[in-house]
A protein has these predicted regions:
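Acidic (Asp/Glu-rich) sequence patches and key acidic residues
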Residues: 1-141
Length: 141
């Protein structure tokens, strides 16, 4: 069963779901939140998480640069053509995975920046595995 991290905006005494992230996302692992409860999260913390995601994006970019240099070395190696093509295909698959990671991390960072902008004027709350919180579910962390 997949677990989720939920973000809510408080409107009067109601909590409106504004985003959710499954356990398989980087956002899920980067945010500190209570289980089956919610806590207030501020603009600064949201922007800090967004910056950590951007750092992951920068790491992926540096890995792509490294792999591109490796591709140049593979093409000039003395291996058979078939071996070279196998190695090149393998490296290109890894590059494609990093490119997907970059797009995903960028999207998550933009989403968190948007939520951080909301936090300037609204109370934003976060929690694991709590889809319909009430006032009594608020904890201080």
């Amino acid at each position: 069963m997949s677990q989720y991290l939920y973000f809510f905006a408080r409107h009067d005494k109601e909590f409106v779901l504004i985003a959710d992230y499954s356990r398989s996302t980087q956002v899920y692992s980067e945010v500190n939140a209570p289980y089956e409860k919610i806590r207030k999260i501020d603009e600064t913390e949201l922007r800090t998480v967004a910056e950590r995601l951007r750092a992951g994006k920068n790491f992926a970019k540096s890995q792509i640069e490294t792999l591109n240099r490796k591709l140049e070395l593979i093409s000039s190696a003395n291996n058979s053509l078939e071996e070279k093509l196998d190695m090149i295909n393998s490296e290109l698959e890894i590059i494609e995975e990093y490119e997907d990671d970059i797009q995903t991390l960028d999207r998550y960072a933009i989403e968190l920046d948007f939520i951080a902008n909301m936090a300037c004027d609204n109370d934003i709350f976060v929690g694991f595995e709590i889809s319909c919180p009430t006032e009594k579910d608020i904890v201080d962390c």
